[in-house]
Each structure stands twice: as C-alpha cells, then as structure tokens.
Amino acid sequence: MDSSGVWRFRELLPDFDGVQPVTLGEGGTPMPEAPRTAAWAGVAGLSVKHLGGNPTGSFKDLGMTVAISEAVRLGRRVVACASTGNTSSSMAAYAGRAGLRSVVLVPSGAVSLAKLAQALDFGSLILEAGTTFDDAFATLQELAAEFGLYVVNSINPLRIEGQKTAILEILEQRDWRAPDLVALPGGNLGNASALGKGLRELHALGWLDRMPRILVSQAAGASPFHRMWQSGTADLEAEPHPQTRATAIRIGRPANWRRARRVLELTQGLTAAVSEAEIAEAKRQLAREGIGCEPASAAAVAGVRQLRLRGEIPEEADVVAILTGHQLKDTDYIVEGERPRREPDRTADLRSQLAGWLKGR
C-alpha cells in the first residue's frame, strides 16, 4: 500500500474497516512541463499531468483501487462495468488482483482493440450490448439488478473518491500553488466531478488559497455537456449518436453531468467542443515534444488552444492539462490515419529516401 499514490492520501479517503486496500501501485504519475506545446496553444505555461502512467495506462486506476477495495469489503464476488475501453482494462486488472470475477459490456465495434485485449488478458467476460456506450450502460444496469453485479462505473461514489487524488497530486507537485486553469477531456464526466470534490475538500481544509478554473473539453460530435453549459439550460439533452474517433469520450449521455455542472459553477469553469482535426493536431503537437497520449487526452490541450484563440483564456495563463490515457491505448488511431503518410519509394536508394524525409517531402 505504501507504493500507492492514492493510498498515501488515505486520511482523505473512506475508512475500509481494516480491509487491506487492493492496489497495483497506482498514482504518483509525472507532470512534465511542455513549453513548445504551451507556445502552440498560446499560453505562458503548460504542464501535463500524465495519468496514462498508471498501471493499466489510464486515470481509471485511481478510482478503481478504491472501488474494488469496497467490493472486497462488502463481500462481493463479481464486478461489472460498461466501457469504451479504459474502465474495462482497469476493472479487470484490479478484479484479478483481488481474486474477483469481472464482466464488461461494450458497444459493438466501438472499442479500441488494445483496450479490449487488456480486459481479455486479465480474464474478464466481454459482452457486446448495443452500438453506443449509453446502450451498454443501460443494459448493464438491468443485468446488475438481475444478477447482483457490483457496478464500478463512475456512478459508483468510491470511484470519485480515488480519482480526486489526481488534483491532490497536481497541487503537491506544484508546491501547493494552484494553476490558473486545469483542462481535462470530458466523456462520462466522472473525472471532472472528482476534481471538483478534491478542490472543495482542499479548500475546506485551508490547503487551497484560490480555485483554479476547470475546462472540460468534449469532442464536437459528442458534446452534450458543452451544449448545455453554453446554452445555460437546466437539463442535458443527450446525443443519441455520438461520433468521434476519440473513443474514450464517445459518450452521448454522461452519467455525471449534474455533478460536473456544479464543479463548473464552483470554479467559474469553461467548456469547449473540439473538432477531430483539432484533436489530431493537439496529439501531434504533444508527440513532437515527446509526450504520447491517446486521442481523448489530446482534446484537453485542443480545448486550451481553441479558447485561447477566442480570447476566453488569457495569454499569461498557467495551465495544467490532464492526459487521461497512454499513447498505446489506441494505436489504430495513429496508424490508420491522422498523420501524413510517407510511403517508402522502393525504387530509390536509402540515401534518397532519408534525404527526402529530412526535407519534409
């Protein structure tokens, strides 16, 4: 447990009545500065908190260690989730660690093979349900009631408890100086909810002198929360057919939208809806600086640039962007298409090929 960046903050987590937490050494991930990406985005400073450095490659591990520990405390034997990939990988690993069985419901044809491979490797039962995350989640709720499954999606409050430690780490790594803005991608909005919970608790403890603004960036084709926030309406209108290649945020009915809205109200927050081209450009920019991430993560940085260009973020802003998933989570995205192709000319010699590449041909 001492190797866990989450359980270092055990005094701020629920009491597990003597149950040994289920941990894989999650947390404690790096937060490098990204000066070239900051210049590209138009802000004075940009650091990236890379939660893809967690054991299964995403931020989900921060919450899953707590949720699976609670399942053990309750004596549950089977855990389940609906997932576009990252939740399933994390749940399967932590369930395996705890000796529990796990069931994953996924939308048909909508999940990265790399993410499915993780869940399969860890021994989960994979079931297809519908064509969107929201279809799979609705089916999960029915099956959970019928079969007594312990659900570990972000509607589970224990997930939020673990994920709030991300903001604790961010502030700790900054010597408890709050940034002007924390940017993150928005899918089911559990992460935004968790950040808000962490900020409220830190402020109540007197550890936070001011609230950073929270920016939630969604893909334009899956942006119901952005539309609600921008329109000022009281209720979220679901997107029945969400579309984006950033599969981790391809969600049309985010379960945590009410909590996320309260977070934006608390922090004078912002939202952005970024195009596929903007996501791809941000991902390339990060990669050129040696920082790899999955497409959904890049949406956070794309949102910073978009709002800076619109004048909604000042040039002098000090920004932390949360990268939620590892580069290897969605290698199909890289291989299939967002980069200019440079097919080798089989008739040219190696020197000519190299010279042409160096010239950017």
Per-region residue spans from a language model:
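PLP-dependent amino-acid enzyme catalytic core
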Residues: 1-361
